[in-house]
Amino acid sequence: MRFFISHLVTLCFIFCVADSTHFSEEGNKGYGPVFEEQPIDTIYPEESSDGQVSMNCRARAVPFPTYKWKLNNWDIDLTKDRYSMVGGRLVISNPEKSRDAGKYVCVVSNIFGTVRSSEATLSFGYLDPFPPEEHYEVKVREGVGAVLLCEPPYHYPDDLSYRWLLNEFPVFIALDRRRFVSQTNGNLYIANVEASDKGNYSCFVSSPSITKSVFSKFIPLIPQADRAKVYPADIKVKFKDTYALLGQNVTLECFALGNPVPELRWSKYLEPMPATAEISMSGAVLKIFNIQYEDEGLYECEAENYKGKDKHQARVYVQASPEWVEHINDTEKDIGSDLYWPCVATGKPIPTIRWLKNGVSFRKGELRIQGLTFEDAGMYQCIAENAHGIIYANAELKIVASPPTFELNPMKKKILAAKGGRVIIECKPKAAPKPKFSWSKGTELLVNGSRIHIWDDGSLEIINVTKLDEGRYTCFAENNRGKANSTGVLEMTEATRITLAPLNVDVTVGENATMQCIASHDPTLDLTFIWSLNGFVIDFEKEHEHYERNVMIKSNGELLIKNVQLRHAGRYTCTAQTIVDNSSASADLVVRGPPGPPGGIRIEEIRDTAVALTWSRGTDNHSPISKYTIQSKTFLSEEWKDAKTEPSDIEGNMESARVIDLIPWMEYEFRIIATNTLGTGEPSMPSQRIRTEGAPPNVAPSDVGGGGGSNRELTITWMPLSREYHYGNNFGYIVAFKPFGEKEWRRVTVTNPEIGRYVHKDESMPPSTQYQVKVKAFNSKGDGPFSLTAVIYSAQDAPTEVPTDVSVKVLSSSEISVSWHHVTEKSVEGYQIRYWAAHDKEAAAQRVQVSNQEYSTKLENLKPNTRYHIDVSAFNSAGYGPPSRTIDIITRKAPPSQRPRIISSVRSGSRYIITWDHVKAMSNESAVEGYKVLYRPDGQHEGKLFSTGKHTIEVPVPSDGEYVVEVRAHSEGGDGEVAQIKISGATAGVPTLLLGLVLPALGVLAYSGF
């Protein structure tokens, strides 16, 4: 049994803190329930033999919790025999859909409170059988598309997968460009039917959730023989508007009928395809993995063959189940204080927030409680929910009341303060409610003044510390539960001072730079130096290739910057630091180097072969920019190339230029690189992608030619122009042709830019006639130049002569020899031999073609003892001539299926004598005429072949290595199955039988062949 798990995410954040109002050593260690396992959505197969289903629930708590379960918000009576509990796990015996389907919640409690689990749905899965009615035959002309409907039976859930059987189980059809099975509806789509598609088809449906499969009654598909016609692309599998959840994988299907098989292309309207998109199933399936919000948009599938194209669009919407931005955690609050518990979730649509306290509905929205009391303590759950899911955050609220105590956090016994500096003495007792604070120095009570301040949190601040401030300081804390104090001694130290500060430095990229930093400090304290660049502390371990410190002299923090790069420029700060105070000094490092990237590329004007660009200067890195270089890239290439510009040399003080000699109607991106005396900088960010304006084509198609084809056809071919030469939209070709020597040209238009072929049909066209042809390109802006004129020939007539003297000869049970007398027509290119079994229709005939120099052939892989019809016809590029008269012939019966049983192999001097039993043919097999024996080296296929009518043969003992002896019966139907033994001349030992058994017989080995 498998479980169908929905993504019900539950976050539990329970950290136990004892309630000070229930002080006992045992109570101080307790905490409320924390879920370790929660129920999940489960599908129980209706046909399951398990007889029970479980819903899991487990929580940790001190003291140990109690469990109860709810079904559709009603308490489950666990005293009934149908239910049992193991810990928190609920076991339902003999589950029934009418009583047990629904939403389950596990409720866990102890003395600290109650929490509810996430809801889990128990549903019942099923997959009914297909209807028993037989299907009618589906007859389709060859070349026409077909759709076989699956129509799956009633089922739950909807996660079905589909395949199609061909003729028998478990033979599944192979999917390719021509055949596609939709995983949305299960239908089988065939772009164009071929004779090989003949057969019986069955829709095979599997439900992974309940591990069950069923298949439909077989649907007979019968292709109707016909001269294949061409049909334009026609999309039949169309994806619908799709709603996907953030992070999910999305599958879109698209498939088209048509002849020839249409090419499928995917795109996203006005945007690039997602980086995680993957196209499979010969283009019929688009998968977007881990979909993100930016992947939302309009997607298009385009199907095209040279006869026409079809498009389909639909939108993908991306939404999201709730996810925590800020959630609640276990909290301990003082009695009488205020509570604000932020609980924020993101999702699409925006989730709603509601609260449970001890498993009972409490509030909605944000949670604020003023003047906390002991009654506010308990287990709280924040629930975020939208249409796509629900998440829980659990936390325990403890209310604390206690007198002040410094046991856990006493004041430091010794506090150090730098002369002339500032010191803060902390006072942090544990107390609830918050205590009032007062301070004394010795016996003197301290009050706020110009140098002394007592903060609300109890801390004491002293500024401009002098020797007179040394002494004993005591903090007093008091609330309505009691009072406490803690004392420490303040001692003054010498202040830390920078005595040699770093100086500004100016270097070139690749050079080294040094920054001095020396400090004085209290000799009783340790001194460390910290360097930062532009406010960020330098990590000397990670940056050891460029930064190095002087660690030899304690008071010297000198910094060495090696192989300076542009990124090292900025403000360096040296901080000399002790545990008491610190002192800092800063200096600037100026780095001269190649320019930074220019910015703000704008395209001001777009022409067919030129664009005008402007940009803003980047940083010159303290060396004036001497020139700019503009580079371009088309969507046809990933390579950036230097562009031709006006002016040809762009000086460093310029911020605009024209790019010329561009390709019309081409998508371009541009970037700019600055150069100064120190080198060439990094390129700018690419500009927005633009398309140049269109222009008439100026390149003629090449390789114009053609000829051949079917009767009464003129076939014209050319090499299609690549995309870069289209120069505009609505691109196509104008094909001109005329009989050789005539004046008027006939013109036709080919609108598919990828097609390089046009076939003109004219029943009055004489065969093998010279034509002059030429081709030119056009687009919406005009026509291009014609190609050079080529001379081709119209198609010749199909042969009219019938092959004569056709004769056939049976060679075996699976082979027939066919011969004929050649025809005299010179246009014949070859001969076609058709043959089909008498019990098949002529449309199912198989064909063999040979050249015009051959007047016989062998038909192989025929069925034994079967009547075949055979005819012969001549053909050329224009078609097939009339067939000869049909000849009937019956193949031989099958050769004997029994292998010879080798009964002995005896060595006698330099010979082996091998004996076998007679093979008796079955009634449907050809009679045995004799035996063939092949004597060959082991591992080779060729050897010496013997024929005999006896049941024994002598073969020489091998001089070296092993030999194999093969024995098979021979009949007019062919050779039967083979039996083998191995013999060797190395020793006098017995030969090895490849398939045999040993019989006790006076030193003679008996074998049975296979």
UniProtKB/Swiss-Prot annotation:
Pfam families: fn3, I-set, Ig_3. Gene3D superfamilies: Immunoglobulins. Residues 597-695, 700-797, 802-897, 899-990 form the Fibronectin type-III domain. Residues 679-708 are annotated as: Disordered. Glycans are attached at N200, N249, N329, N448, N464, N485, N512, N582, N924. Residues 679-689 have a biased composition (Polar residues). It is found in: Cell membrane. GO terms for cellular component: axon; plasma membrane; side of membrane. Coiled coil: none annotated. Residues 1-19 form the signal peptide. Residues 985-1010 form a propeptide. InterPro entries: Contactin-1_2_Ig1, Contactin-1_Ig3, Contactin-1_Ig6, FN3_dom, FN3_sf, Ig-like_dom, Ig-like_dom_sf, Ig-like_fold. Keywords: Cell adhesion, Cell membrane, Disulfide bond, Glycoprotein, GPI-anchor, Immunoglobulin domain, Lipoprotein, Membrane, Repeat, Signal. One of its GO terms (molecular function) is cell-cell adhesion mediator activity. It comes from the Eukaryota. It is a lipid-anchor; GPI-anchor. A lipid is attached at S984 (GPI-anchor amidated serine). Residues 33-123, 132-215, 232-317, 322-398, 404-491, 496-592 form the Ig-like C2-type domain. Belongs to the immunoglobulin superfamily. Contactin family. This is Contactin-1. It comes from Gallus gallus (Chicken). The gene is CNTN1.
